[in-house]
Amino acid sequence: ALCEGIGEQVTPLSAMPEYWIVITKPRFSLSTSEVFSSPLIARAYGADSTNLVISSLKSGKSANVVFSGAQNALESASISLCPAIARLKELMLKNGAFFSMMSGSGSSVYGVFDSHKAASDAFGLIRSQFPNTYITKPCPNAVEFI
């Protein structure tokens, strides 16, 4: 689903390609106001990045293609405040993720994996260092309201 505003505007999208996600919330946190006040926020992202991801989803592209257009405008600002976020992204990639990015304004980081086995293997290794680590996959209908 495409969530806009502060998450209250939800637009269903076509079904997601098959992939698995490992998400980690490190012990450290970031101040949202500090992140948003950083001059490093990449204002060039936004609509173009979102439109590329949505277009890839609508045309049934593979997860690798869908995520190749994903960007987080807050990531550079958050990494400047907490370089460990970059190390956590590297850890995801070293352990088999084909894509990794910070979630929101941080400090959570997720990795995207092409198989349950790859995600499970990474989950075990990463969780041994970061207890707040979880494994999940998108719901097949792209959006479900519970």
Q: Where are these predicted regions, by residue range?
A:
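Short hydrophobic/aromatic beta-strand micro-patches
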Residues: Y110-V112
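Glycine-rich GHKL/ HATPase_c ATP-binding element in histidine kinases
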Residues: S107
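Conserved, helical-rich catalytic subdomain that frames metal- and/or nucleotide-binding sites
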Residues: C3-F99, D114-R127, P131, I135-I146
